[in-house]
């Protein structure tokens, strides 16, 4: 896999509430030079980043609580709406796992519906925190995420564990299943501990073995903060 192919699906990430304007300009300058799919930042940085980025590079805003997702639909909706007003093209939002036999249930459905409504017209990536879930829960949550209209299911924040090979297999299988059963093409975003080219190539090979059509920035993303240095070597 060549460097351009990786850049085309990369969400270059800087999630630091204390990031200075110089920090944000630095990541935007790198993005403008190398052309990733998106730059992913906290919602309070969206307006500044949008003004620094070239056209064609999306701004992805993390909204609604991170790394712990919010549990109030109104608060999540307002957070996402603020990010959209600031210029976000894409929204990354955590659906916080609950330690309950009814997870995912009606409460989680209401949160997902709020995320989708608030991000209408924008790309929505729902983070399900796979390191905290077993296989059954990963499958069930992914199906609910896709059924409520999210554009991508995203593995994890990376703050409570990383993206495993099994996560890539399960998420891509469920996205393929949704495409076959519902006729709707959705995407997978893999993030959490992805630092070197070999990580990307291995995970993409797993996705490709499930469904070769899950490719390109509209259906596959890699979220990483330090990967760029490695792939440019």
Give names to the regions the model predicted.
Residues 5-21, 60-77, 98-103, 125-137, ...:
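Active-site mouth loops of central-metabolism enzymes
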Residues 6-14, 39-41, 58-64, 91-93, ...:
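Hydrophobic faces of well-ordered beta-strands that scaffold small-molecule active sites
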Residues 11, 49, 83, 126, ...:
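Conserved, mostly hydrophobic/aromatic
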Residues 28-48, 64, 91-107, 156-164:
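Glycine-rich, proline-tolerant flexible connector loops at the mouths of alpha/beta enzymes
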Residues 36-90:
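Active-site cofactor/substrate anionic-group-binding motifs, chiefly glycine-
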Residues 43, 47-66, 103-130, 143, ...:
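Alpha-helix-loop-beta-strand connector modules within alpha/beta enzyme cores
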Residues 61-67, 85-99, 147-164, 191-199, ...:
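Glycine-rich phosphate-binding active-site loops on the catalytic face of alpha/beta enzymes
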Residues 71-82, 133-144, 168-172, 184-210:
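Catalytic cores of alpha/beta
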